[in-house]
Amino acid sequence: MGKVSVAEIKELMTATGVGMMDCKKALVEADGDMEKAVTLLREKGLATQAKKSGRVAAEGICTAVVKGNVGCVLEVNIETDFAANNDEFKAFVAAVADTVIETNPADVDALKATKISGGDKTVEETLQDLFIKIRENMVIRRFKRMEGILVPYVHGAGSIGVMVKLDSDIAADNAELLAAGKDCALQVAAMNPAYLNRDCLLYTSDAADEL
């Protein structure tokens, strides 16, 4: 098949988010078979992703999300700050945070193998699809899932994420309690303290001495 229609190219671009010329080449190679063209684009994207996996992902987003009494603080890295501001990348980070809250994965590898929140693919498969569009190395760096009275804080566009857990007999929706939690979160974001109080430091030192 030598030619493909503009409508076919647009359909493939809409389905994959890939550029016009790449979609045209894939359709020509696939003899106009739309499903085969999608597969070809995915295979080429995965090959490129493997080549770029060693590139440093120094930018990214930290997010902190609470739903009910369960929360997640998450860091996902990408190569450039320009790509970090991409709406689809931001949506991916938000969906991954929801996945952590909903499924409680044991670690990053388990998270990547889990079906992503609101989708029909795993987190890893969704990341691979996003790579085909953005063409930058992305890394789910770390996450922490917590339960209890939680107060989240995200600094700026996501350069810092903080989750504060409060132990209190006061109702979880008490405005003064939440304001105190917010103040603590702001302090953590500003100062990056190594421990909660002096007792925590002494406990850590004692444990190290015992070893």
Segment roles from a protein language model:
Residues 206-211:
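A short, hydrophobic C-terminal helix/tail in secreted or cell-surface proteins
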Residues 2-205:
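N-terminal assembly/interaction segments in proteins that build large macromolecular machines
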